[in-house]
Amino acid sequence: NFYQKTKNIIKLFSKMLEHKNVNFFGNINVGSDVSIEFISENYDAVVIASGAENDKKLNISGETKNGIYGSGQFVGWYNGNPIHSNLSPNFNCKNIVIIGNGNVALDCARVIAKTKEEFYQSDIMEYALSALNQSSVENIYII
């Protein structure tokens, strides 16, 4: 059963990474290999998905700039957590970066990449659905 669950996760990751607008960059340490300043200057939005129950601070310069959100904030926003309901991610852009490559990072990418049709019968919050349906995002980069 554990093997089957692992196999299903691998299939999910593979399908996600096959999306034409999703790019994966592995073996990169944000803060030493590339700076958050470089990322935020070259991409329109950044989600930090560092695999923690609470958003993990990377302790790197620039991580608190506008338009940079922890994955917990972002997931909380589209799932209706009142603490994050006032978040206003900018999807009126071409490029988004997600820092992290775990399940939550891929969930964030999956939600951002969905089409209007794919949100049919979704339980996503109406305000998030409205923002995502107006998205002009063309590329999602996962680092």
Placement of each model-derived feature along the sequence:
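Short hydrophobic core segments
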Residues: 41-51, 96-99
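Short, structured coil segments at secondary-structure junctions
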Residues: 20, 42, 63-64
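Beta1-alpha1 glycine-rich phosphate/pyrophosphate-binding loop at the start
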Residues: 1-30, 38, 110-143
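Ferredoxin-type iron-sulfur electron-transfer modules and their immediate structural context
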Residues: 1-7, 48-61
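Glycine-rich, histidine-containing beta strand-loop boundary motifs that form or position
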Residues: 13, 20, 26-28, 49-52, ...
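A short, aliphatic-rich alpha-helical micro-motif
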Residues: 40-41, 91
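Glycine-rich dinucleotide-binding loop and its adjacent helix/turn
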Residues: 55-134
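A conserved short coil-to-beta-strand element within the FAD-binding core of flavoproteins
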Residues: 25-40, 52-55, 60
